[in-house]
């Protein structure tokens, strides 16, 4: 009996480490919780010392949540520095296309590609001290210094801007202005929005915490049933 209990606890901790949700909550609640933390990993593995969100874990979980009749809503908890654009946008598109209500909550930060992830929900919250960093697309590694490279950068950036504008209340011109701000970050281009600032700019729906996020999600779930 003790061995079975130890095995269950170890298995549960393993699932919590991989997916950010304990098995017990899955069995007793109609709400699925998705955590997006650290750096959104792309097609290459990051170092063992980095906290990451792996798209190969997240995308199947979202697909399973869509097909699971016991799941009535999704709560997305976000504290990310950003990461791979393609993977981040893929997750954001999956969240936005779910037929079930989704609420997001920005806890520490939702930087870079974390911005589309935060606004992909049906309703979004940010804690008063939460931050969102908006900046142009950047790339590491070998870059060929030709005009086609910069055109490619612009196309990627246009995809991000288009997604954010279509899933929030911010205007395209204002988002671009914040993205290209040069007077705020000492060694970078872009802007940092804190708490209510993100709400005033139209990126986030409301400032609040976990209680507010659950309350709103239950409201959306009830409205869907009615």
Predicted regions and their residues:
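N-terminal organellar transit peptides
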Residues: 1-115, 119-135, 139-226
């Amino acid at each position: 009996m003790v061995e079975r209990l130890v095995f269950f606890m170890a298995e549960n901790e393993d699932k919590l480490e991989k997916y950010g949700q304990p098995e017990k909550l899955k069995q007793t609640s109609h709400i699925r919780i998705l955590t997006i933390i650290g750096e959104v990993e792309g097609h290459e593995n990051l170092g063992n010392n980095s906290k990451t969100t792996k798209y190969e874990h997240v995308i199947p979980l979202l697909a399973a949540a869509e097909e699971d009749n016991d799941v009535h809503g999704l709560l997305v908890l976000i504290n990310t520095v950003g990461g791979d654009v393609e993977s981040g946008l893929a997750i954001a598109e999956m969240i936005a296309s779910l037929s079930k209500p989704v609420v997001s909550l920005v806890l520490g930060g939702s930087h870079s590609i974390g911005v589309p992830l935060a606004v992909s929900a049906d309703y979004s919250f940010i804690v008063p001290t939460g931050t969102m960093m908006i900046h142009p697309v950047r790339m590491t590694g070998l870059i060929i210094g030709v005009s086609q490279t910069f055109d490619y950068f612009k196309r990627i950036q246009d995809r991000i801007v288009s997604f954010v504008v279509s899933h929030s209340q911010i205007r395209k011109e204002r988002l671009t202005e914040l993205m290209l701000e040069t007077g705020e970050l000492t060694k970078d281009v872009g802007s940092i929005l804190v708490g209510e600032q993100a709400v005033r700019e139209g990126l986030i729906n409301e400032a609040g915490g976990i209680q507010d996020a659950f309350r709103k999600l239950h409201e959306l779930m009830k409205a869907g049933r009615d």
